[in-house]
Amino acid sequence: MAHSIWHEKIKSFLPEHYYGRINHFLDEAYASGLVYPQRENVFKALQVTPLEETKVLILGQDPYHGPKQAQGISFSVPEEISAPPSLINILKELADDIGPRDHHDLSTWASQGVLLLNACLTVPAGQANGHAGLIWEPFTDAVIKVLNEKDSPVVFILWGAYARKKKAFITNPKHHIIESPHPSPLSSYRGFFGSKPFSRTNAMLEKEGMIGIDWLQ
């Protein structure tokens, strides 16, 4: 289901047989209609960013619900797909903060230790938040709790009110939190623009003796 170390750690924060419930949910959801991302990519965020390499978390809400957008990592879309509004604003803030990045696929961030996690890992086509409140939040809350237990520092980037509620799970004083309004067009001008999350993250990592993220890669 997921990277094995992730799997063992996450399981300790969930009720017994919860993974079985997730599999049953996925069987029913994918059998009953079009769901994003493709099933093999539901746990991609955990597969491409191993726990031992994770040093940044960017928490999204749920996958993009349009055709060919969702990849299994938050905010990212395939290179040939136009950037959705939130990603446009993320790249605009990145350009103002560090420099321009022309591509929309954020997989290179994931390979550097940036866990691009959505709180809800699936969505019905065309129905934003259509799977919210059903199965995923205990699982992804467990991911945050696992990261909170890490001995090495993690920078948690929390955009928007929904993500900021997850601060309750981040109690380890070794970690850092960067929070701001969400990059969506509805809230980006309320404090997301100008928040400089990318340079601030690297400053925090480098202060801890860790290698910063090449956000432009």
Curated annotation (Swiss-Prot):
Alphabetically, which GO biological process terms does the record hold? base-excision repair, AP site formation via deaminated base removal
In terms of superkingdom, the source organism counts as Bacteria
Q: What class of enzyme is it?
A: hydrolase
Gene label: ung
Q: Kindly provide the name given to this protein in its UniProt entry.
A: Uracil-DNA glycosylase
- To which protein family does this belong? Belongs to the uracil-DNA glycosylase (UDG) superfamily. UNG family.
Q: How is this protein annotated for GO cellular component?
A: cytoplasm
- This entry's Enzyme Commission designation comes to 3.2.2.27
* Main localization category: cytoplasm
The protein's role, per its UniProt record: Excises uracil residues from the DNA which can arise as a result of misincorporation of dUMP residues by DNA polymerase or due to deamination of cytosine.
MF-aspect GO terms: uracil DNA N-glycosylase activity
**Signal sequence, renumbered to the chain:** none
What Gene3D superfamilies would the database entry show? Uracil-DNA glycosylase-like domain
Tell me the keywords, alphabetical order: Cytoplasm, DNA damage, DNA repair, Hydrolase
| Localization (cell) | Cytoplasm
- Which residues catalyse the reaction? D62
Which InterPro entries does UniProt cross-reference here? UDG_fam1 (IPR002043), Ura-DNA_Glyclase_AS (IPR018085), Uracil-DNA_glycosylase-like (IPR005122), Uracil-DNA_glycosylase-like_sf (IPR036895)
Asked if the Swiss-Prot or TrEMBL record annotates the protein with the keyword Methyltransferase, the reply is no
> What chemistry does it catalyse, as a reaction equation?
Hydrolyzes single-stranded DNA or mismatched double-stranded DNA and polynucleotides, releasing free uracil
